[in-house]
Amino acid sequence: MEAIWLYQFRLIVIGDSTVGKSCLIRRFTEGRFAQVSDPTVGVDFFSRLVEIEPGKRIKLQIWDTAGQERFRSITRAYYRNSVGGLLLFDITNRRSFQNVHEWLEETKVHVQPYQIVFVLVGHKCDLDTQRQVTRHEAEKLAAAYGMKYIETSARDAINVEKAFTDLTRDIYELVKRGDITIQEGWEGVKSGFVPNVVHSSEEVVKSERRCLC
């Protein structure tokens, strides 16, 4: 029987508070944008299936982390069991861009001995007239850390699918090459799930959400 999904990838979304992490994830998993969003307390959990090639689906387990300092000790615990992530900054908030280095350094400390595949995301690109960070300097920073760079807008649904799908494809290619392997005791990558019964296509493509506070 064909697996519903080939692999499960655990992803984290990190960045300063108010950069729009929760809005981006909800746009991707639920297809909606909330004008008002309460700050994440601790960690929120979402999931969605992504078809990277015809008939090849990856289940994404996405962890939305709180950006406030008082919750950082909680969110750090989720770094080690993630294989990939989106690192967000707000293009209208230069401080959030300046803090990208701090987020990356913190992640390196807590993921050992593993590594996380990151994509740098300049969020809220619909507010281009208020931009405080140029695309050029963001691309330069991303290149310095070996990351891809993409600009997104949860409000206008710009590049949201692309950000998650591109990251998923990059991880999948690393798994196929053997650069990333399934390891006992590590939740970053899991092998596919085969159900006991055949589900309809409507049942397969679902998003689910759980809040861990």
Curated annotation (Swiss-Prot):
Mg(2+) binds at residues 22, 40, 64. Keywords: Autophagy, Cell membrane, Cytoplasmic vesicle, Golgi apparatus, GTP-binding, Hydrolase, Lipoprotein, Lysosome, Magnesium, Membrane, Metal-binding, Methylation, Nucleotide-binding, Phosphoprotein, Prenylation, Protein transport, Transport. The keyword Iron does not apply. It is an enzyme of class 3 (hydrolase). Coiled coil: none annotated. It holds the Pfam family Ras. It is found in: Cell membrane; Cytoplasmic vesicle membrane; Golgi apparatus; Cytoplasmic vesicle, Autophagosome membrane. It comes from the Eukaryota. The modification Cysteine methyl ester is found at residue 213. GTP binds at residues 17, 20-23, 37, 40, 67, 123-124, 126, 154-155. Residues 35-43 are annotated as: Switch-I. GO terms for molecular function: G protein activity; GTP binding; GTPase activity; myosin V binding. It catalyses: GTP + H2O = GDP + phosphate + H(+). One of its GO terms (biological process) is protein transport. Residues 67-83 are annotated as: Switch-II. This is Ras-related protein Rab-39B. It comes from Bos taurus (Bovine).
